Amino acid sequence: MKEITVTEPAFVTHFSCSGSACRDHCCKGWKITLDKTTVKKYLASKDTAIRTIAQDHIILLKKNNSHWGEIKLPSALGNCPYLDEDRLCRVQKTLGAKALSHTCSSFPRAHHTYKNEVRNSLSLACPEVTSRILNDPDAMALSEKTIIQQTFNTAPLFPAQQKLLNLFCLSLINHANSSTEAALYALIKFVMYAQKFAKIDDAALGELEQVYAALLEQLQTGVLAQELMNIAPDSKVKTSLVLQMQDYFRSLPLNRGSVILDHYIQCLLRVLTAEEGVSMEQKVSDIESSLARCLQADEQQKNWAFRNLILYKIWENNFPNQPNVDPLRALYIIVAEYAFIKLLTAASVHERGRLEWDDVTNIVYSFHSRSQHNSEVAKNFHRHIETVRTGDDLSMIHLLT
């Protein structure tokens, strides 16, 4: 028998689907794939409604056993035909949870499997997941348990060096207090130092531990926050990000989350173009000031909401250990996503005159629903971010100023 370590953040442990109460349920507006077993089960079901819907609404593709068919939706934003009048799944109610396809039974859950470890996570494309991360100060607290199984998983080993690097990065962000930007600045410095080593061995880790300790002290004493404030801002980097991002999202076909995200993008564009004679760069500065004032007045949630979002990104992506991705480039993507989400939030605050965390939840989940619902969608989105980066990874510092 073999021991397997299972690690997961608190938001995973405590997650439960909100069902019919969900603000934007996952049974609509995107591709629902069905495996071969599920297709055959529905087509042969003794339940007349299940069988009839299968005959009328399952498109047989037979690409492979995992992608044998797809649900045909009535429109780009239409509901799955198995969703009943109470916004609950007819299959689950009639046949039980075991009758669900892999797609329907697994979302929003994700499992990153290694030889003797499993890291559990959840997708931010689910609004309930996003709400937990933004509203629970302990959402990213990690816990471990050991399970026993007959054999090791058929997956590569999770190297101890990679695990330690990931923990260093998580810890730097976790000590951000209310300055997530300063913590990201510390992370940039840490990654730049790590890239000096051709190989991360025990000797390199010894040096990196000293660098981590020094950066942590500079974070806690406010040195890095002051250093970041002293960097002359370049708002053109942010306006370029806005234009590229809105261009990308508006070019996508309609799917789940598109109406919500477009509402906030339109809000941002209105705010940035409202006054003639005022540059977009100045308007960016104005709306950021509005958000900063509202965050300053928020005595609690400001200290963890955006910090938790970055912690999630580092955990979910096993940063900085993504295969075949330069760590600075991977960090640029994290910073660019964070900056755009903050700008959408700032525009909403500027128009409303107040900060509503429900707006932030809407922005974050719809952003991820549109950009990272699956690996192929995420790759296309990250390729688009490359046009903003213009070959200069360190321009991300200007997204933090």
From Swiss-Prot:
- List S-S links within the chain: none
* GO terms of biological process kind: methylation
Key words, A-Z: Methyltransferase, Transferase
* EC identifiers of the protein: 2.1.1.-
* Residue ranges crossing the lipid bilayer per the database entry: none
Q: Origin, by domain of life? A: Bacteria
Quick check: keyword Zinc-finger in the entry?
A: no
GO terms of molecular function: methyltransferase activity
Q: What does this protein do?
A: Post-translationally modifies flagellin by methylation of epsilon amino group of surface-exposed lysine residues.
Q: Which family does it belong to?
A: Belongs to the FliB family.
Please identify the protein, giving its name as recorded. Lysine-N-methylase
Q: Which organism is it from?
A: Salmonella choleraesuis (strain SC-B67)
